[in-house]
């Protein structure tokens, strides 16, 4: 019995021992090679299962390394801690678990070179000298930190002092280099390496930020430009501020170089004093392989020519195992091009941060940075390489956050790659088949296997050699402010359906493509240095016919376009024909350039036109109108730049939109051309999906060959197509009192909604209509294509096919709408008697017959057809306010229609009324367009007396007394009545000007009097001005008072402008010129700033007593009211996101040389409490000022709680004061208490000057946030960070919090699933 128990105990001990050491097995190899250690790359990630060998094999250098003695109180490296340490020769050391050592390179009299340093505990390197090693292995749980440069030597290099010809070979080539197997590596240099620069002259540049002090160093830099993507060396001298560099002994800086980057490069062979190396930056030499859920942080490091993987087809090392012993390798087939030997190869690591680093490779490699199932945040870095890609993102890489990086690629020849690739793969397959005949257990290394069944490069995970910026298989990418130049594709996506074949994972979440999100904001792409082909893409997608779950894309393409194309299948050559016009798939044979701004996103499977079964002709329109674009963030401009013929003077642009309503509120749509608004906040309202067409004219006065068309919406209106027409001056059709339709409409849908009055017909005989369709249920998103939609001339023809059956009903509807809009007589206007010296035309009496109206019109020689004049974006003149009372006649107080009292009214066209007219509506020859502000427009009215009596005629024209937006220019001659003889005709001319954005839709009266009796009829004026920043005061409706500032008589209301909820800031006009100048300054600044984190300026308006500033409305209120007055408790991650958005906005303002002057939570508006998109925007620019040539502004009228010490000292308000105020606001948001509430308000200036800062609950704030706060409000203003630095730190903090939250939610979900499974099992058992 005892023997059986002992046997079981021994068996258990053996099992436990085997289990504990299963991850690290010793693999014996043939003579001449290192024995290998087998490492499970993802042993604890159960979702990854594979039938193939995915283990990692690295040289067994740690097993016999010298292990340190752990001596209490000794935490610094000394040789005596490692028994057997040889001070005269190479050593391999092992930092044991639970031990921590500090290596001070400069304090040691001897420079120690290590063959291997294995870290299972903690190892820190400090000092100014390089840390020289052959291999650094960070074991699971180990931690390595260094502020010194790391220099690698090759132990087999015959020139090296430690060369030993008996050193065995590393079959996989991990060393020299770094191997991280699940620990933490942090290599951070103190000084910046990469700088942005602007050209001053051929031999001088200005860099940003300024260089750090550089004393006694070899001042050599490498300059990268578009002409020289690999850079060139320069010596230099700098000014005292270290911003202006005078270049010596180098190539000139070309005027054509728009992108200039500067790198401080330090090499070992430079004559630099070791004590000064620290000041010039750190270099890292050696291939780096990171795996096993490691934590990675590199900052200000230089990775130079580390990559060994060439741009040739992969050829990996293969191990031939003994069929009788899984730990014995019988043969090694050495690979010639292993895929993981890039400068930096990272896999299965979700916490990777790279900041301010430089990657440089002038040899032809595959890529400097390769990611496999890893997430990375990379910022402020430079990647210049002669490679297939700057970055390759393989399976499972779910997130790349890239900001302010420069991706530079040298032109490469890819012509022979595909042929060589297939030949190589076929050879590899033959080798694999032969090997498999010998051993069924033949395995490849590191998930880098050539699959026998794969015979093309993509199926073998051999990709990214085409000349890409970022080549991606599955990640979500957020690119913000990056610069790409020289690539064939800036972003190249490849979706492969059978991931198990390629990733060797048979049961994995990677088997299905995940949702894709690509967001590109303010990034630029210049393909100047690529291979010269016209087929260059910012974004390219190759799906091989596979579908992803969903796709959320922002795209920007710079390739040439067809006039029209389909979007169903990019690889198809399908064409469809409408009336002989062809529409083709894709844009590979395009004719004419078109780009779409980077802040847009695609939506697929929009409601289909073909659902309208009564329109047999439009069945195929599904393929044209099933996709559309809109902005990522609400109310942000999406800009379409399209090519036109510079020799054609007049154009008509037609945009076709699909409205998918998200609620019952109207959606405002604004359209701009060349930065000039054409439609502003036009409300689109429907309860079901609707198509809307907008058409406008453009006069190409400057012979442009490309125009910018933009639109803004809250996100539920999609631009599905665009058509451009060249046009000529078209004379208006003959007008008659009674319009007779020329076409009979055919059957139309019964549910067609009322047409929007702003929609206009195209220049053809076929009309425009709206088509309403039912919204499709369960829309399944498809892969969005890489080409942003811009359908040109032929689209208009297709639209006409859709809509030609609605001509008469829409014409009547438009007319009825106009009449309804003008049916109300305005009161409170001054009476104007219109008098015009009559032009009497004698004609014979015609008893019982009507006058010939056609002849009346033919006599009118004043009708013209002015073409719309497009101006530049509204200048200061357009928004200029006046504090002088307007003296124009429209500011009267009498009733315009008071003289109509006791007069009999007749309907227009009544047979009993004695007069006839050539038109009922005065449109001032605009023909559907809008007039420009301040444009003088003219019209005339032919009046015919059809009676036998002479009449006295008065024309009573309405006036606008509220805002003065309507100015009657020839009012001085309308001061008395005139006579009109029987059967005579006269012409009355009208001239007026609209001085703001307004709709002048009014009735005017024609009053006739004879023999003591009076009668009148009404005609109409229908004029609308173009959109601008100067609004009509009467169209602004205030509803709810939000805030008031009584001393200055400033009030803030919630209101409405043309059915759009807005914030209205109303000022009372006073005699105080200073107060009025302040209002003008706020208007000027608002009109210039345009950023997603700054409240959107809609316009301003003025009447006799008040000025209004209108901005977008934040329904959540201010951040100050949210934290102090609301019962809602904000989470920590919400607060960080809100202040991150604010910091981004202030970064933009400071870059525009604008100081806000009044930063506090009350001036941060909350638009969304979600932690995605834009949550907070900056408002209230009453204290803002443009610095211009000045370095500071005078003390603002700001709250003392947020003013810094230097302002109280009288130094003026600078950018640093904004940073101080932001720090105080960040503190207030975190602790939710008014800053300085613990002291008397009047004591704040003195206490702040003495260095006192808010202390209440400061110690409860998160350490990272508290450091930001303390840096912001530090007394020395020169030490305060910039907002770009603040934004970066908040961005990193937010990303970490978001990652933790997602992990927590995933853990909770898994727990709930397991609990539910257990409950189900218990139920089954019961």
Curated annotation (Swiss-Prot):
Keywords: ATP-binding, Kinase, Membrane, Nucleotide-binding, Serine/threonine-protein kinase, Signal, Transferase, Transmembrane, Transmembrane helix. The keyword Transmembrane helix applies. The chain crosses the membrane at residues 783-803. Residues 1-22 form the signal peptide. Residues 419-467, 731-762, 833-858, 1301-1326 are annotated as: Disordered. Residues 23-782 are extracellular. Residues 804-1326 are cytoplasmic. InterPro entries: GDT_regulator, Kinase-like_dom_sf, Prot_kinase_dom, Ser-Thr/Tyr_kinase_cat_dom, Ser/Thr_kinase_AS, STKINASEGDT. This is Probable serine/threonine-protein kinase gdt8. It comes from Dictyostelium discoideum.
């Amino acid at each position: 019995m005892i023997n059986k128990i002992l046997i079981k105990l021994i068996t258990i001990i053996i099992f436990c021992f085997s289990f504990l050491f299963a991850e690290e097995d010793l693999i014996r190899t043939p003579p001449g090679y290192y024995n290998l250690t087998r490492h499970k790359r993802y042993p604890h990630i159960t979702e990854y299962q594979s039938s193939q060998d995915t283990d990692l094999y690295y040289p067994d250098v740690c097993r016999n390394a010298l292990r340190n003695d752990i001596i209490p109180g000794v935490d610094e490296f000394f040789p005596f801690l490692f028994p057997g340490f040889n001070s005269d020769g190479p050593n391999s050391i092992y930092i044991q678990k639970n031990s921590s050592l500090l290596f001070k390179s400069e304090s040691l009299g001897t420079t120690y070179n290590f063959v291997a340093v294995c870290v299972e505990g903690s190892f820190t390197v400090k000092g100014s000298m390089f840390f020289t090693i052959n291999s650094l292995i960070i074991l699971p749980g180990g931690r390595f930190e260094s502020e010194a440069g790391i220099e690698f030597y090759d132990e087999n290099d015959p020139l090296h002092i430690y060369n030993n010809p008996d050193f065995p070979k590393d079959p996989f080539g991990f060393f020299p280099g770094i191997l991280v197997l699940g620990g933490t590596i942090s290599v951070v240099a103190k000084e910046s390496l990469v700088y942005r620069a602007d050209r001053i002259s051929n031999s001088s540049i200005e860099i940003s930020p300024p260089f750090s002090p550089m004393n006694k160093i070899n001042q050599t830099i490498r300059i990268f430009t578009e002409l020289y993507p690999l850079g060139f060396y320069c010596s230099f001298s700098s000014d005292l501020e270290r911003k202006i560099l005078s270049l010596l002994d180098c190539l000139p800086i070309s005027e054509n170089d728009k992108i200039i980057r500067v790198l401080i490069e330090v090499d070992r062979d430079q004559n630099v004093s070791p004590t000064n190396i620290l000041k010039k930056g750190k270099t890292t030499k050696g291939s780096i392989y990171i795996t096993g859920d490691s934590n990675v942080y590199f900052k200000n490091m230089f990775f130079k020519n580390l990559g060994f993987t060439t741009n040739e087809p992969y050829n990996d090392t293969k191990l031939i195992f003994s069929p009788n012993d899984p730990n014995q390798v019988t043969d090694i087939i050495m690979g010639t091009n292993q895929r993981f030997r890039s400068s930096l190869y990272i896999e299965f690591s979700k916490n990777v941060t790279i900041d301010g680093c430089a990657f440089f490779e002038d040899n032809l490699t595959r890529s400097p940075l390769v990611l496999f199932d890893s997430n990375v945040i990379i910022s402020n870095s430079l990647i210049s390489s002669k490679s297939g890609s700057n970055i390759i993102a393989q399976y499972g890489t779910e997130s790349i956050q890239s900001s302010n990086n420069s991706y530079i690629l040298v032109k490469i020849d890819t012509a022979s790659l595909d042929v060589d690739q297939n030949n190589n793969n076929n050879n590899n397959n033959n080798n694999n088949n032969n090997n498999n005949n010998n051993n069924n257990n033949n395995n490849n290394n590191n998930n880098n296997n050539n699959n026998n069944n794969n015979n093309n490069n993509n199926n073998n995970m051999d990709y990214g050699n085409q000349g890409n910026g970022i080549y991606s298989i599955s990640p979500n990418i957020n690119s913000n402010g990056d610069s790409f130049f020289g690539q064939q594709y800036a972003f190249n996506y490849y979706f492969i359906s059978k991931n198990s074949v390629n990733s060797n994972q048979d049961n994995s979440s990677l088997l299905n493509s995940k949702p894709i999100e690509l967001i590109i904001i303010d990034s630029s792409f210049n393909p100047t240095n690529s291979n010269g082909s016209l087929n260059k893409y910012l974004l390219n997608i190759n799906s091989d016919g596979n579908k992803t779950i969903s796709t959320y894309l922002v795209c920007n393409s710079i390739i040439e376009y067809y006039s029209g194309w389909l979007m169903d299948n990019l690889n198809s050559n399908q064409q469809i024909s409408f009336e002989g016009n062809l529409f083709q798939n894709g844009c590979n044979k395009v004719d004419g350039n078109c780009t779409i701004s980077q802040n847009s996103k695609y939506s697929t499977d929009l409601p289909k036109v073909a659902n309208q079964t009564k329109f047999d002709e439009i069945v195929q329109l599904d393929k044209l109108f099933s996709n559309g674009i809109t902005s990522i963030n609400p109310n942000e401009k999406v800009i379409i730049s399209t090519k036109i013929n510079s020799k054609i003077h007049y154009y008509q642009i037609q945009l076709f939109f699909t409205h998918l309503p998200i609620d019952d509120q109207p959606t405002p749509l604004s359209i701009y051309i060349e930065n000039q608004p054409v439609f502003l906040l036009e409300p689109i309202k429907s309860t079901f999906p609707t198509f809307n067409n907008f058409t406008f004219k453009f006069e190409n006065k400057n012979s442009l060959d490309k125009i910018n068309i933009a639109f803004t919406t809250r996100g539920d209106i999609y631009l599905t197509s665009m058509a451009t027409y060249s046009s000529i001056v078209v004379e208006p059709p003959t007008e008659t009192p009674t319009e007779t339709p020329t076409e009979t409409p055919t059957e139309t849908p019964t549910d067609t909604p009322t047409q929007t009055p702003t929609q206009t017909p195209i220049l053809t005989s076929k009309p425009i209509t709206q088509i309403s369709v039912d919204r499709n249920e369960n829309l399944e998103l498809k892969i969005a294509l890489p080409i942003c939609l811009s359908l040109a001339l032929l689209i208009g023809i297709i639209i006409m096919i859709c809509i030609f059956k609605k001509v008469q009903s829409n014409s009547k509807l438009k007319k009825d709408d106009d009449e309804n809009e003008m049916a109300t007589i305005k009161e409170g206007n001054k009476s104007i008697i219109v008098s015009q010296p009559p032009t009497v035309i004698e004609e014979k009496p015609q008893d019982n017959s009507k006058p010939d109206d056609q002849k009346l019109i033919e006599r009118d020689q004043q009708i013209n057809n002015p073409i719309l004049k497009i101006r530049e974006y509204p200048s200061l003149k357009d928004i200029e306010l006046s504090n002088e009372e307007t003296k124009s006649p429209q500011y009267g107080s009498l009733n315009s229609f008071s003289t109509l009292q006791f007069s009999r009214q007749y309907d227009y066209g009544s047979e009993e009324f004695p007069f006839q007219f050539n038109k009922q509506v005065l449109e001032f020859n605009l023909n559907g367009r809008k007039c420009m502000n301040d444009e003088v427009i003219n019209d005339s009215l032919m009046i015919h007396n059809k009676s036998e009596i002479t009449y006295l005629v008065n024309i009573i024209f309405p006036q606008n007394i509220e805002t003065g937006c309507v100015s009657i220019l020839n009012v001085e001659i309308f001061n008395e009545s005139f006579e009109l003889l029987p059967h005579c005709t006269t012409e009355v001319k009208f001239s007026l000007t609209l001085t703001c954005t307004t709709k002048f839709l009014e009735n005017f009266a024609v009053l006739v009097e004879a023999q003591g009796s009076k009668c009148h009829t009404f005609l109409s004026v229908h004029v609308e001005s173009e959109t601008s920043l100067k609004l009509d005061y009467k169209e602004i409706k205030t509803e709810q008072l939000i805030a008031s500032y009584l001393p200055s008589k400033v009030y803030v209301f919630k209101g409405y402008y043309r059915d759009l909820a807005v914030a209205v800031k109303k000022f009372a006009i006073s005699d105080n010129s200073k107060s009025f100048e302040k209002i003008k300054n706020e208007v000027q600044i608002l009109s210039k700033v345009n950023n997603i984190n700054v409240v959107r300026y809609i316009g301003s308006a003025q009447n006799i007593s008040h000025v209004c500033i209108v901005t977008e409305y934040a329904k959540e209120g201010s951040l100050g009211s949210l934290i102090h007055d609301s019962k809602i408790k904000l989470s920590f991650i919400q607060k960080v996101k809100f202040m991150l958005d604010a910091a981004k906005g202030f970064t933009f303002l400071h870059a525009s040389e604008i100081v806000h002057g009044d930063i506090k939570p009350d001036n941060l508006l909350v638009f969304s409490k979600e932690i995605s998109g834009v949550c907070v925007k900056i408002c209230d620019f009453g204290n803002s000022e443009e610095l211009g040539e000045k370095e500071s502004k005078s003390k603002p009228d700001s709250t003392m709680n947020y003013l810094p010490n230097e302002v109280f000292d009288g130094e003026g308000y600078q950018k640093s004061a904004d940073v101080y105020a932001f720090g105080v606001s960040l503190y207030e948001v975190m602790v939710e208490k008014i800053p300085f509430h613990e002291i008397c308000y009047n004591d704040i200036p003195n206490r702040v000057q003495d260095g006192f800062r808010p202390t209440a609950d400061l110690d409860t704030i998160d350490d990272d946030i508290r450091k930001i706060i303390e840096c912001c409000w530090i007394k020395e203003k020169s030490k305060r960070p910039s907002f770009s630095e603040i934004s970066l730190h908040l961005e990193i903090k937010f990303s970490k919090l978001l990652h933790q939250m997602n992990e927590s939610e995933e853990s909770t979900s898994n727990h709930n699933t397991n609990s539910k499974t257990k409950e189900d099992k218990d139920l089954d058992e019961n």
